[in-house]
Amino acid sequence: MKGHEPVVYDRASELGGKIRSAIPSSRLPKEVFDHELRRIMGKVTRVKLGEDGITEELFMDIRDRYEYTVIAVGAQNPRELKIKGHEKAVAALGFLRRAKVNDIAVGEKVVVIGAGNVGCDAATEAYRLGAGEVTLIDIQEPASFGKEREAAEASGAKFLWPVAAEAITRKGVVLSSGEVLGADTVIISIGDKPDLGFLPDTIDTADGYIKVDSRYRTADMKVYAIGDSVRPGLITDAIGAGRSVALSIDASFRGVDESYDRLPAIDTARIRLEYYDPGVREFQDIQVCSVACASCGGCRDCGMCETLCPQQAISRRPLQGEGYEYVVNDERCIGCGFCSGACPCGIWELKENDPIG
């Protein structure tokens, strides 16, 4: 959208990462994800899929070929729980991937070691696949929260803490107390870590993650890193980091230095509040609240600018997929400002032309 041409490399046959392959559809409906991906791909036309087995040589080739490189490889390697019989268990990430395509049987009883949000997703999916009893255990108070925790509890999952797993046998999970939790399937959900074996020595790491500054730049000024390759976090964290990096790269191309973390998303003076019903509303369900979002700074495709333009200088142009853009015919535009004055979200901005002569 800033006028640059990004190129995306991905080892999978389809874009989407864990959102497509592992996160349950109950968390993010497939139709919503597909719609958002089509919208994004309306802007990104250069995609190279099936780039499996990235090596340092390939990475350096990419790094040298383009002005900037953004590492967003996520965390795909499950952390190991080094207890006796751990090979009898399945990692949560692998379980969720197979569960999403209904390619795994769970049996009657399931024990999940690790009661974070991913563990809750695994528990909920286990119930969907036919489990009758699911128990999540943790050595400390579970870190799970929000919809994931609520969904697991609503499905019937039990939480036990603080308890520690000593071994995994054919009968189930042996606790440090000697108690055995019977299980047909044991799922280990203690986190994932990124595979950074392709990084050159010029990019610093710490504790298995890429070291970055406040703008997500690595020790190599041409390379940025975001998401779980930097630190464990939420999808929204990765999306926000991606936006910050995009703005930072654009600023570099323009030869300016801007601190986006301290700038508002849009000047509130540009928002036409007369279009909205004012009032303080109590917090409700997140989906209810999201419907009321005015999308300040983002086009809602209302078409008011195109309708009101007295010179018919504005037109809507479809892009690839479900994308679109509104364009101005410079030969028709008279600078009346109707578009800027009518836009509910503050998209249009009038700028003076350079003096002639």
Predicted regions and their residues:
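Beta1-alpha1 glycine-rich phosphate/pyrophosphate-binding loop at the start
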Residues: 1-53, 79, 84, 115-158, ...
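Flanking helices and flexible, charged tails adjoining ferredoxin-like Fe-S electron-transfer domains
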Residues: 5, 20-42, 46, 59, ...
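Iron-sulfur cluster-binding cysteine motifs and their immediate structural context
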Residues: 7, 11-14, 81-82, 198, ...
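Short hydrophobic core segments
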Residues: 9, 66-74, 112-113, 183-191
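Conserved beta-strand-loop-beta-strand element in the redox core of flavoprotein oxidoreductases
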Residues: 49-69, 168-180
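FAD-site-proximal beta/loop scaffold in flavoenzymes
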Residues: 87-108, 181, 185-240
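A conserved FAD-binding loop/helix module that cradles the flavin
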Residues: 122, 226-259
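Mid-to-C-terminal Rossmann-like scaffold of FAD/NAD(P)H-dependent oxidoreductases
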Residues: 150, 154-155, 164-167, 244, ...
